């Protein structure tokens, strides 16, 4: 695992043109035995089961988000996933027809930095976002929990 931290600054007085228009979160506790940190031991996971699960859930979440914006220009949609495994991310992007240039990631530079991964990618690209853009975040993480979010960039003012 890499080392990373992220922070969000929120304001009730300064308006923003960037806002989340959709967010869902869920988990699959019945698969508890696939990712385990025993009381007296080390992190252990069933790699094949977890990888397959991550690909399916990331792809499903991404497709769910894209279904919310069917008329959006595909050149204005960007994808960010959990930064644990570049192969998982690339597979999900390909299955959802996201062009490589629209798949943002940094796992190749920093490794798996846990829950700071996706926010750090968003932070790296924040100033590139323009009105009419969308960022689809589909994240699968520890505890076999997943979330999908749609960040919409509206016109200024």
Regions found by a protein language model. Give the residues of each.
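Condensing-enzyme catalytic core mediating Claisen C-C bond formation in acyl metabolism
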Residues: 1-56, 60, 140, 152-157
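Conserved active-site "lid/cap" helical segment
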Residues: 35-77, 87-100
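Generic low-polarity alpha-helical segments
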Residues: 9, 71, 79-81
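Claisen-condensing/thiolase-fold acyl-transfer catalytic domains that form or cleave C-C bonds
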Residues: 59, 77-157
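Short loop/turn motifs at secondary-structure junctions
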Residues: 19, 72-75, 131
